Design a protein with these regions (language model features):
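Conserved active-site and cofactor/substrate-binding residues in soluble primary-metabolism enzymes
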Residues: 21, 25, 45, 64, ...
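Rossmann-like NAD(P)H-binding beta-loop-alpha module
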Residues: 151-219, 230, 238
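ATP-dependent carboxylate/acyl-activation modules
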Residues: 303-354
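N-terminal glycine-/serine-/threonine-rich beta1-alpha1-beta2 phosphate-ribose binding loop
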Residues: 4-126
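A short hydrophobic/small-residue beta-strand
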Residues: 131-132
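Short, ordered loop/turn segments at secondary-structure junctions
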Residues: 55, 136-137, 162-164, 329
Length: 354
Protein backbone atom coordinates (compact mmCIF):
# COMPACT_ATOMS: atom_id res chain seq x y z
CA UNK A 1 0.00 0.00 0.00
CA UNK A 2 1.19 3.50 -0.82
CA UNK A 3 1.02 5.89 2.10
CA UNK A 4 1.63 9.62 2.22
CA UNK A 5 5.29 10.52 2.37
CA UNK A 6 6.43 7.21 0.86
CA UNK A 7 8.94 7.46 -1.96
CA UNK A 8 10.07 3.84 -2.10
CA UNK A 9 8.64 1.34 -4.57
CA UNK A 10 5.11 0.59 -3.41
CA UNK A 11 1.86 -0.77 -4.77
CA UNK A 12 -1.22 1.30 -5.50
CA UNK A 13 -4.26 -0.95 -5.52
CA UNK A 14 -7.16 0.20 -7.68
CA UNK A 15 -10.81 -0.91 -7.57
CA UNK A 16 -12.85 -0.16 -10.69
CA UNK A 17 -16.62 0.25 -10.41
CA UNK A 18 -17.79 -0.19 -13.98
CA UNK A 19 -16.00 -1.45 -17.08
CA UNK A 20 -17.58 0.38 -19.97
CA UNK A 21 -15.90 2.66 -22.49
CA UNK A 22 -14.07 4.77 -19.92
CA UNK A 23 -12.98 1.77 -17.88
CA UNK A 24 -11.58 -0.19 -20.79
CA UNK A 25 -9.82 2.88 -22.17
CA UNK A 26 -8.26 3.47 -18.75
CA UNK A 27 -7.14 -0.16 -18.59
CA UNK A 28 -5.47 0.09 -21.99
CA UNK A 29 -3.61 3.27 -21.05
CA UNK A 30 -2.52 1.78 -17.73
CA UNK A 31 -1.14 -1.30 -19.48
CA UNK A 32 0.77 0.89 -21.93
CA UNK A 33 2.26 3.16 -19.26
CA UNK A 34 2.75 0.73 -16.36
CA UNK A 35 6.52 0.47 -16.73
CA UNK A 36 6.91 4.23 -17.11
CA UNK A 37 4.86 4.86 -13.96
CA UNK A 38 7.12 2.48 -12.04
CA UNK A 39 10.18 4.24 -13.43
CA UNK A 40 9.06 7.83 -12.83
CA UNK A 41 6.94 7.44 -9.68
CA UNK A 42 8.26 4.27 -8.11
CA UNK A 43 4.73 2.92 -7.85
CA UNK A 44 3.33 -0.38 -9.09
CA UNK A 45 -0.32 0.32 -10.01
CA UNK A 46 -2.44 -2.82 -9.78
CA UNK A 47 -6.16 -3.22 -10.45
CA UNK A 48 -7.52 -5.70 -7.91
CA UNK A 49 -11.27 -5.49 -8.55
CA UNK A 50 -13.63 -4.69 -11.43
CA UNK A 51 -17.40 -4.65 -10.95
CA UNK A 52 -20.34 -4.33 -13.32
CA UNK A 53 -24.06 -4.08 -12.69
CA UNK A 54 -25.18 -7.24 -14.49
CA UNK A 55 -22.18 -8.66 -16.34
CA UNK A 56 -20.26 -10.11 -13.42
CA UNK A 57 -17.25 -8.91 -11.47
CA UNK A 58 -13.58 -9.81 -11.16
CA UNK A 59 -11.42 -9.85 -8.04
CA UNK A 60 -7.84 -10.84 -7.28
CA UNK A 61 -6.08 -9.60 -4.17
CA UNK A 62 -2.77 -9.54 -6.06
CA UNK A 63 -3.61 -8.09 -9.50
CA UNK A 64 -6.06 -8.65 -12.35
CA UNK A 65 -5.01 -9.22 -15.95
CA UNK A 66 -6.57 -6.20 -17.68
CA UNK A 67 -5.95 -7.51 -21.18
CA UNK A 68 -7.88 -10.66 -20.31
CA UNK A 69 -10.66 -8.66 -18.64
CA UNK A 70 -11.11 -6.54 -21.76
CA UNK A 71 -11.03 -9.61 -24.01
CA UNK A 72 -13.83 -11.27 -22.04
CA UNK A 73 -15.98 -8.15 -22.06
CA UNK A 74 -15.37 -7.43 -25.75
CA UNK A 75 -16.01 -10.97 -26.96
CA UNK A 76 -19.02 -11.94 -24.85
CA UNK A 77 -20.25 -8.72 -23.25
CA UNK A 78 -19.68 -10.13 -19.78
CA UNK A 79 -17.05 -11.66 -17.56
CA UNK A 80 -16.45 -15.41 -17.78
CA UNK A 81 -17.99 -17.25 -14.81
CA UNK A 82 -15.42 -20.02 -15.22
CA UNK A 83 -12.55 -17.58 -14.68
CA UNK A 84 -10.71 -18.08 -11.36
CA UNK A 85 -11.02 -14.35 -10.72
CA UNK A 86 -14.78 -14.19 -11.35
CA UNK A 87 -16.74 -12.78 -8.44
CA UNK A 88 -20.34 -12.07 -7.51
CA UNK A 89 -19.40 -9.04 -5.43
CA UNK A 90 -21.38 -5.86 -6.05
CA UNK A 91 -19.82 -2.42 -6.33
CA UNK A 92 -20.80 -1.64 -2.74
CA UNK A 93 -19.34 -4.97 -1.56
CA UNK A 94 -16.01 -3.99 -3.10
CA UNK A 95 -16.13 -0.43 -1.75
CA UNK A 96 -16.80 -1.62 1.80
CA UNK A 97 -14.68 -4.77 2.08
CA UNK A 98 -11.83 -4.96 -0.43
CA UNK A 99 -8.28 -3.78 0.33
CA UNK A 100 -7.66 -0.98 -2.20
CA UNK A 101 -6.16 2.51 -2.23
CA UNK A 102 -8.13 4.20 -5.01
CA UNK A 103 -11.65 3.55 -6.27
CA UNK A 104 -12.65 4.57 -9.79
CA UNK A 105 -16.36 5.46 -9.96
CA UNK A 106 -17.33 4.54 -13.53
CA UNK A 107 -20.88 3.27 -13.02
CA UNK A 108 -23.82 4.45 -15.18
CA UNK A 109 -25.08 7.98 -14.61
CA UNK A 110 -28.29 8.77 -12.74
CA UNK A 111 -28.69 12.37 -13.78
CA UNK A 112 -31.63 13.05 -11.44
CA UNK A 113 -30.17 11.87 -8.10
CA UNK A 114 -26.52 10.91 -8.54
CA UNK A 115 -27.26 7.56 -6.88
CA UNK A 116 -25.98 4.92 -6.30
CA UNK A 117 -22.63 6.39 -7.36
CA UNK A 118 -22.77 8.94 -4.54
CA UNK A 119 -23.15 6.11 -2.02
CA UNK A 120 -20.09 4.35 -3.46
CA UNK A 121 -17.99 7.52 -3.19
CA UNK A 122 -19.27 8.36 0.27
CA UNK A 123 -18.41 4.91 1.66
CA UNK A 124 -14.96 4.92 0.07
CA UNK A 125 -14.14 8.34 1.50
CA UNK A 126 -15.35 7.28 4.94
CA UNK A 127 -12.74 4.52 4.78
CA UNK A 128 -10.10 7.10 3.91
CA UNK A 129 -9.77 5.78 0.35
CA UNK A 130 -8.97 8.05 -2.58
CA UNK A 131 -11.65 8.53 -5.25
CA UNK A 132 -11.52 9.24 -8.98
CA UNK A 133 -14.95 9.76 -10.55
CA UNK A 134 -15.97 9.89 -14.20
CA UNK A 135 -19.59 10.02 -13.04
CA UNK A 136 -20.95 13.57 -12.98
CA UNK A 137 -24.08 12.72 -10.98
CA UNK A 138 -22.50 12.73 -7.50
CA UNK A 139 -20.79 16.06 -8.15
CA UNK A 140 -23.91 17.65 -9.59
CA UNK A 141 -26.07 16.68 -6.61
CA UNK A 142 -23.74 16.14 -3.65
CA UNK A 143 -20.47 17.94 -4.40
CA UNK A 144 -20.04 19.91 -1.18
CA UNK A 145 -20.74 16.91 1.06
CA UNK A 146 -18.28 14.70 -0.82
CA UNK A 147 -15.60 17.40 -1.02
CA UNK A 148 -15.82 18.00 2.73
CA UNK A 149 -15.81 14.26 3.45
CA UNK A 150 -12.64 13.85 1.38
CA UNK A 151 -10.94 16.66 3.29
CA UNK A 152 -12.02 15.26 6.65
CA UNK A 153 -10.55 11.86 5.80
CA UNK A 154 -7.37 13.17 4.14
CA UNK A 155 -8.37 11.59 0.83
CA UNK A 156 -8.03 12.75 -2.77
CA UNK A 157 -11.22 13.35 -4.76
CA UNK A 158 -10.64 14.01 -8.47
CA UNK A 159 -13.14 14.12 -11.34
CA UNK A 160 -11.56 15.45 -14.54
CA UNK A 161 -13.61 13.23 -16.86
CA UNK A 162 -17.01 14.48 -15.69
CA UNK A 163 -17.32 17.48 -18.02
CA UNK A 164 -14.98 17.44 -21.05
CA UNK A 165 -13.48 13.92 -21.03
CA UNK A 166 -9.72 14.28 -20.55
CA UNK A 167 -9.57 18.03 -21.26
CA UNK A 168 -7.89 19.36 -18.09
CA UNK A 169 -10.43 21.99 -17.01
CA UNK A 170 -10.29 21.20 -13.30
CA UNK A 171 -6.55 20.53 -13.35
CA UNK A 172 -6.00 23.96 -14.85
CA UNK A 173 -8.31 25.66 -12.36
CA UNK A 174 -6.74 23.85 -9.38
CA UNK A 175 -3.07 24.07 -10.31
CA UNK A 176 -2.62 26.85 -12.87
CA UNK A 177 -5.11 29.44 -11.62
CA UNK A 178 -4.31 29.48 -7.92
CA UNK A 179 -5.36 32.75 -6.24
CA UNK A 180 -7.47 33.63 -9.28
CA UNK A 181 -11.13 34.39 -8.68
CA UNK A 182 -13.45 32.80 -11.24
CA UNK A 183 -16.89 34.41 -11.25
CA UNK A 184 -18.17 33.48 -14.70
CA UNK A 185 -18.22 30.34 -16.84
CA UNK A 186 -19.65 29.90 -20.32
CA UNK A 187 -19.41 27.16 -22.88
CA UNK A 188 -20.84 24.38 -25.00
CA UNK A 189 -20.78 21.22 -22.92
CA UNK A 190 -22.99 18.66 -24.68
CA UNK A 191 -21.51 17.03 -27.79
CA UNK A 192 -24.77 15.38 -28.90
CA UNK A 193 -26.77 18.60 -29.18
CA UNK A 194 -23.80 20.31 -30.79
CA UNK A 195 -23.82 17.59 -33.47
CA UNK A 196 -27.61 17.76 -33.89
CA UNK A 197 -27.63 21.53 -34.39
CA UNK A 198 -24.80 21.26 -36.92
CA UNK A 199 -26.72 18.62 -38.90
CA UNK A 200 -29.91 20.70 -38.77
CA UNK A 201 -28.02 23.47 -40.56
CA UNK A 202 -28.01 21.09 -43.55
CA UNK A 203 -31.84 21.22 -43.59
CA UNK A 204 -32.17 17.82 -41.91
CA UNK A 205 -34.97 17.59 -39.35
CA UNK A 206 -34.33 16.80 -35.69
CA UNK A 207 -36.32 13.58 -36.01
CA UNK A 208 -34.26 12.35 -38.98
CA UNK A 209 -30.98 13.21 -37.25
CA UNK A 210 -32.03 11.33 -34.13
CA UNK A 211 -33.09 8.31 -36.17
CA UNK A 212 -29.79 8.23 -38.07
CA UNK A 213 -27.85 8.64 -34.84
CA UNK A 214 -29.60 5.72 -33.17
CA UNK A 215 -29.19 3.51 -36.23
CA UNK A 216 -25.51 4.46 -36.45
CA UNK A 217 -24.97 3.59 -32.80
CA UNK A 218 -23.48 6.96 -31.83
CA UNK A 219 -26.60 8.32 -30.14
CA UNK A 220 -28.56 6.90 -27.21
CA UNK A 221 -31.93 5.28 -27.88
CA UNK A 222 -33.31 7.91 -25.52
CA UNK A 223 -31.39 11.13 -26.10
CA UNK A 224 -33.84 13.24 -24.10
CA UNK A 225 -31.21 13.90 -21.41
CA UNK A 226 -29.22 15.62 -24.14
CA UNK A 227 -31.95 17.33 -26.13
CA UNK A 228 -33.80 18.58 -23.03
CA UNK A 229 -30.59 20.08 -21.65
CA UNK A 230 -30.22 17.89 -18.56
CA UNK A 231 -26.73 16.65 -19.40
CA UNK A 232 -25.51 20.18 -20.10
CA UNK A 233 -27.15 21.43 -16.89
CA UNK A 234 -25.44 18.71 -14.84
CA UNK A 235 -22.05 19.52 -16.36
CA UNK A 236 -22.54 23.25 -15.76
CA UNK A 237 -23.47 22.47 -12.16
CA UNK A 238 -20.27 20.46 -11.68
CA UNK A 239 -18.18 23.31 -13.09
CA UNK A 240 -19.90 25.91 -10.93
CA UNK A 241 -19.65 23.79 -7.78
CA UNK A 242 -16.01 22.81 -8.21
CA UNK A 243 -14.60 26.01 -9.71
CA UNK A 244 -16.91 28.72 -8.32
CA UNK A 245 -17.86 27.03 -5.01
CA UNK A 246 -21.50 27.57 -5.99
CA UNK A 247 -23.22 24.76 -4.02
CA UNK A 248 -26.11 24.31 -6.47
CA UNK A 249 -27.88 21.36 -8.09
CA UNK A 250 -29.10 20.78 -11.68
CA UNK A 251 -32.73 21.55 -10.82
CA UNK A 252 -31.68 25.13 -9.99
CA UNK A 253 -30.33 25.71 -13.49
CA UNK A 254 -32.62 27.71 -15.81
CA UNK A 255 -32.85 25.01 -18.48
CA UNK A 256 -34.22 25.01 -22.03
CA UNK A 257 -33.34 22.23 -24.46
CA UNK A 258 -33.24 22.14 -28.26
CA UNK A 259 -36.46 20.22 -28.88
CA UNK A 260 -38.22 23.41 -29.96
CA UNK A 261 -35.57 24.36 -32.52
CA UNK A 262 -36.55 23.89 -36.18
CA UNK A 263 -34.61 24.03 -39.43
CA UNK A 264 -36.38 27.35 -40.09
CA UNK A 265 -34.85 28.71 -36.87
CA UNK A 266 -31.43 27.52 -38.02
CA UNK A 267 -31.84 29.12 -41.45
CA UNK A 268 -33.17 32.40 -40.02
CA UNK A 269 -30.15 32.62 -37.72
CA UNK A 270 -27.85 31.88 -40.64
CA UNK A 271 -29.39 34.74 -42.62
CA UNK A 272 -28.37 37.03 -39.76
CA UNK A 273 -24.81 35.68 -39.81
CA UNK A 274 -25.35 33.53 -36.73
CA UNK A 275 -25.52 29.87 -35.70
CA UNK A 276 -27.60 28.35 -32.92
CA UNK A 277 -25.77 26.62 -30.07
CA UNK A 278 -26.89 25.17 -26.74
CA UNK A 279 -25.00 27.58 -24.49
CA UNK A 280 -24.19 27.06 -20.82
CA UNK A 281 -23.64 30.10 -18.60
CA UNK A 282 -22.85 30.31 -14.90
CA UNK A 283 -22.17 33.50 -12.97
CA UNK A 284 -21.58 34.82 -9.47
CA UNK A 285 -23.16 38.24 -9.08
CA UNK A 286 -22.04 41.25 -7.04
CA UNK A 287 -24.40 40.33 -4.19
CA UNK A 288 -22.82 36.85 -3.94
CA UNK A 289 -25.71 34.93 -5.51
CA UNK A 290 -25.06 32.47 -8.33
CA UNK A 291 -27.17 31.67 -11.37
CA UNK A 292 -26.85 29.11 -14.12
CA UNK A 293 -28.58 28.88 -17.48
CA UNK A 294 -28.66 26.37 -20.33
CA UNK A 295 -30.50 27.46 -23.47
CA UNK A 296 -30.21 27.68 -27.27
CA UNK A 297 -28.70 31.00 -28.35
CA UNK A 298 -27.70 32.66 -31.57
CA UNK A 299 -23.93 32.99 -31.75
CA UNK A 300 -22.10 35.08 -34.38
CA UNK A 301 -20.39 32.92 -37.01
CA UNK A 302 -17.12 34.68 -36.16
CA UNK A 303 -17.30 33.61 -32.49
CA UNK A 304 -15.13 30.76 -31.21
CA UNK A 305 -18.31 29.01 -30.01
CA UNK A 306 -19.53 28.84 -33.63
CA UNK A 307 -16.60 26.68 -34.80
CA UNK A 308 -18.24 23.57 -36.28
CA UNK A 309 -15.14 21.49 -35.59
CA UNK A 310 -15.62 21.84 -31.84
CA UNK A 311 -17.01 19.03 -29.73
CA UNK A 312 -17.03 21.13 -26.56
CA UNK A 313 -15.60 24.42 -25.32
CA UNK A 314 -15.51 26.28 -22.01
CA UNK A 315 -14.39 29.79 -21.08
CA UNK A 316 -13.41 30.82 -17.55
CA UNK A 317 -13.49 34.50 -16.62
CA UNK A 318 -10.86 35.32 -14.00
CA UNK A 319 -9.84 38.48 -12.16
CA UNK A 320 -6.08 38.04 -12.66
CA UNK A 321 -5.76 36.15 -15.96
CA UNK A 322 -8.74 37.49 -17.86
CA UNK A 323 -10.71 35.12 -20.09
CA UNK A 324 -9.27 31.66 -20.69
CA UNK A 325 -10.84 29.26 -23.18
CA UNK A 326 -10.30 25.50 -23.53
CA UNK A 327 -11.49 23.77 -26.70
CA UNK A 328 -12.05 20.10 -27.48
CA UNK A 329 -11.89 19.22 -31.18
CA UNK A 330 -12.42 15.49 -31.03
CA UNK A 331 -14.12 12.93 -28.84
CA UNK A 332 -12.24 9.64 -28.69
CA UNK A 333 -12.52 6.90 -26.10
CA UNK A 334 -8.83 7.42 -25.34
CA UNK A 335 -9.57 10.94 -24.12
CA UNK A 336 -12.16 9.69 -21.65
CA UNK A 337 -9.82 7.00 -20.39
CA UNK A 338 -6.98 9.50 -20.13
CA UNK A 339 -9.03 11.74 -17.85
CA UNK A 340 -9.47 8.83 -15.42
CA UNK A 341 -5.83 7.82 -15.83
CA UNK A 342 -4.34 11.25 -15.18
CA UNK A 343 -6.53 11.68 -12.09
CA UNK A 344 -5.06 8.40 -10.82
CA UNK A 345 -1.57 9.78 -11.46
CA UNK A 346 -2.58 12.94 -9.56
CA UNK A 347 -3.47 10.73 -6.61
CA UNK A 348 0.00 9.16 -6.73
CA UNK A 349 1.71 12.54 -7.06
CA UNK A 350 -0.31 14.00 -4.18
CA UNK A 351 0.57 11.10 -1.90
CA UNK A 352 4.26 11.24 -2.78
CA UNK A 353 4.39 15.02 -2.39
CA UNK A 354 2.65 15.02 0.99
Amino acid sequence: MLRKGDRKMKQLKVAMLGYGIAGRAFAEILDQTHAEIMKTRGVDVRVVAITTGSRGSLYCMDSLNLTEATRQMTESGKFDKSSPTFSSMSSMDVVKTVDYDVVLELTPLNIFTGLPATDHIREALKRGKHVVSANKGPLAWHYKELRDLAKANNACFFFETTVMAGTPVFNMADNCLQFCKIDKIEGILNATTNYILKEMSKDISLEDIMRAGREGGFMEADASMDTEGWDAAAKLTVLMNAIMDADITPDLIDRTGINGITTDDINDAKARGNVIKLMCRGERHADGTVTGKVAPEEVPESDVFADERLVAVVSLYTDLMGKLTMMQYGLETTQTGYGVFIDTIRVIDTIIRD
